[in-house]
Amino acid sequence: AASDVYKRQVAIYSKEDTLSLHRNRADEAYLVGEGKGPIDAYLDIEDIMRIAREHDVDAIHPGYGFLSENSQLAKRCAEEGFIFIGPRLEHLIMFGDKINARTQAELAGIPMIPGSTGTVSSVEEVRAFADKHGFPIIIKAVNGGGGRGMRMVASMGELEQAYSLAKSEALKAFGSDDIYLEKYLQNPKHIEVQIIGDTHGNIVHLHERDCSVQRRHQKLVEVAPAFSLPQQLRSRICEAAVKLMKNVDYISAGTVEFLATPDNNFYFIEVNPRIQVEHTVTEEITGIDIVQTQIKIAEGYSIHDPEIAIPEQKDIITHGHAIQCRITTEDPANNFMPDTGKLIAYRSGGGFGVRLDGGNAFTGSVITPYYDSLLVKATTWGLTHQIAISKMLRCLKEFRIRGVKTNILFLENVLQHPQFTDGSYSTKFVDDNTDLFIFPKTHDRGTKLLNYIADISINGYSNVGVQPKPEFAPLNMPK
């Protein structure tokens, strides 16, 4: 996105990411957090400020990872005079606290899931909430995101352990063990709405995404638009998202997340004040580059200016269907255990209607245990949902990734499942369909051949015996 608008790009990288693609693709790249661990290096806000000062940086984009919702980064950018490409500081603070976010949604008149009025600090409070609202309930981290710090509780017997696990996970992931409670809805769809707002008071939605294919509250496959929901319900959800964000004068890209139930009702979950991993499917069906739009909004443009060219809400239409699959170095047959190692071979899919957003996906890349296991995002577009599925299946089958395990066979099973085809799946889809984890035996001929060539190159032909030179009788030639 920065290259498209002719912006000089300065990247940061940790010692462990020395060979990463983003370091080599940027115009300039500098080591951050020298002497610190792989995570702490990227969280070193003061060192980021130093690099920005020393290398004439004008603006900082937080990405969608470590610091994407960190209000301290936005605050330091303002103090140092750097443009923060994202929401205002107040919005990061407002929506970073999930209880505060619920309050804002309530003020906007958005339907809410029954929940605790504030944080809970004892098992007794959780028991009281369960007695009032009934099981199942869900425990959530106040500062949470990405499915971490969340535990569903189905009975009193599970309550104490779930409470302890949620608090410890929240503390480890977010630096705070504050939690709150919500009633757990059975078999909903996870629907989110992409919002764009500028500094001129304009706020629009770019329609919705269906993110219901998930495991342990972490998304695996995303679809846009949410074609399986009635159009009237989709419109109501999008209008509610815009209403909430207009109420707080939101700026930049953001996502409002909801649960939609089988009775065609919907309920607010949270706001993510950042760009999200799955923004690609929205870009494909609307033709709007969301990250590039963020950059231009930060420069002061209106979303309706020619430089951005987003039309009025009534003229923002969708065209076709898009699917995103997150290809990860995880082993679905082993409880999605992350795998590490070196990619000894890598070949990606491609073709018309296929988009790849790569991480460190290349032959020779070393997959470490330090960061997220996402290897590459594959997004396909088609005039219909079925066409998008067909293109994705072809794309996945064209991939050749050797050296580490991946979830590609699992993704193929998801795409071919009847519930995914007709859109009738819910957030329980993966849990309820154990057949998704039945995989055909792979021949893996490529890896076997590579291993064989490497072995004989180093060790010789150990399986071929060396015979003594044969002796032949003198040849009698006729005279």
Language-model features and meaning:
Residues 1-256, 260-276:
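N-terminal beta-alpha lobe that positions the nucleotide/phosphoryl donor
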Residues 241, 280-479:
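Catalytic cores of soluble metabolic enzymes centered on carboxylation/carboxyl-transfer
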